[in-house]
Amino acid sequence: MKGLYIKTYGCQMNVYDSILMENIVKPLGFNVVSDAEQADLVILNTCHIREKAAEKLYSELGRIHSSQKNKEMTIVVAGCVAQAEGEEVFRRAPFVDIVVGPQSIPALPELIVKASRSKGHVINTDFPEVAKFDKLPDECYGNSQGSSAFLAIQEGCDKFCTFCVVPYTRGAEYSRPVNEIFREALNLVKNGAKEITLLGQNVNAYHGECEGEVWDLGKLISHIAKIEKLERIRYTTSHPRDMHESLYLVHAEESKLMPFVHLPVQSGSNKILHAMNRKHTAEEYLGIIDRLRKLKPEIEFSSDFIVGFPGETEKDFEETMKLVEKVKYAQAYSFKYSPRPGTPGAERKDQVPEEVKTERLLRLQELISKQQLEFNQSMIGKTIPVLFSDKKGKHQNQIIGKSPYMQSVCVDDPDDKYKDKIVNVRILEARQNSLLGCAA
């Protein structure tokens, strides 16, 4: 067997795509290895959402090339950098053999064969008329991912936020048919999944076909929840514009749906939200939060924030801080604005100085960290259900699981009893990024 090494950068959709690529090349005689030096085929599945994420690719390529012992190794750059930069990847890293975009994954086996025969550069960054999900063989879907699994139900974006490359790298919004998703969910559960996270760039924009009808995300979740041995359902990433009635109601009514929503807002300033083309206001966003909390009092939230978008003033930034204070997030992710080539935001003349972005980011992260620690501390003394996988902790006999709120929970498991199980855990101690407890 030949060695396959895959390194994944970025979002959960990339993790899912890497699983698809692994499954689609295995029939060519590849088995996964843990080190690029042992590999005959190296795939770097990339992220282009920020400049730093893209530059990680070229750093890793340089490292692999400098330590390359196998002269027959095939190097593939996949994902959003591949889609956005195309031939530029070959210019910056001429030793790369294949560049393949996210929508061209079904062509990967053919590209590998072509590259081995031609010994030249091979590229496919097409947006085919037939969605990639419809072109991949059935055996690519539903294989074991352990006790927690990803399932892509929607891909692409029609929102065209002015800071974002996703519409250009992932294409227009596409929703997979209901029956196809349900079949994959059944297979995942059959192969050990107790939790499924439904994925999409705008997952709550889902509008999949089922026997002549169009289903939204709320209806899909209710349907998937009928799978008997499935115990937890999550979804990510959602957009405030796509919240709809059945999604609100399924949060209130379906116990398998976790009480945790990742709902990116990006800014608390209406002026900046308008400049970002978000097409919602801070007040509308807060209204969504309030309604979900009324329907499901134990629900908690995470979000994404961009600091220093062009034109952001101190007043605009303070409005973001006020929104964070109002919501009180369980966790949140924050980044300095990174101009992406080809996006309207990158063309603006009123870019915020780097030192101002850095200072604001530190202030925001301090507030977010404070809220996260307070939320974690609020769990002390409570007993919560924790899903464990095979992830080990820093200490001997320690295993790590996930709370309903995506917190890492560490417990001692000397007899290896908790792997792939949901266990009630009493929380004894809270840290910034984790909880410590014991089986109740």
UniProtKB/Swiss-Prot annotation:
Intracellular or extracellular location(s): Cytoplasm
Its name, as the record gives it, is tRNA-2-methylthio-N(6)-dimethylallyladenosine synthase
**Domain Radical SAM core per the UniProt entry, residue ranges:** 143-374
Looking at the Swiss-Prot or TrEMBL record, what is one Pfam family this protein matches? UPF0004
Where this protein primarily resides, as one coarse class? cytoplasm
Similarity annotation: Belongs to the methylthiotransferase family. MiaB subfamily.
**EC identifiers of the protein:** 2.8.4.3
Q: Where does [4Fe-4S] cluster 1 bind?
A: C11, C47, C80
Q: What does this protein do?
A: Catalyzes the methylthiolation of N6-(dimethylallyl)adenosine (i(6)A), leading to the formation of 2-methylthio-N6-(dimethylallyl)adenosine (ms(2)i(6)A) at position 37 in tRNAs that read codons beginning with uridine.
Q: Which CDD domains match?
A: Radical_SAM
Matching entries from PANTHER family are given as: CDK5 REGULATORY SUBUNIT-ASSOCIATED PROTEIN 1, MITOCHONDRIAL TRNA METHYLTHIOTRANSFERASE CDK5RAP1
Give residue ranges for domain MTTase N-terminal: 2-117
Q: Where is the TRAM domain?
A: 377-440
EC supergroup of this enzyme: transferase
Q: Which keywords label this protein?
A: 4Fe-4S, Cytoplasm, Iron, Iron-sulfur, Metal-binding, S-adenosyl-L-methionine, Transferase, tRNA processing
**Self-association and partners:** Monomer.
Record's GO cellular component, any one?
cytosol
Q: Which Gene3D superfamilies match?
A: Methylthiotransferase, N-terminal domain, tm_1862 like domain
Q: Which NCBIfam families match?
A: miaB-methiolase (TIGR01574), MiaB/RimO family radical SAM methylthiotransferase (TIGR00089)
- Cofactor names: [4Fe-4S] cluster
Q: Name one GO molecular function term.
A: 4 iron, 4 sulfur cluster binding
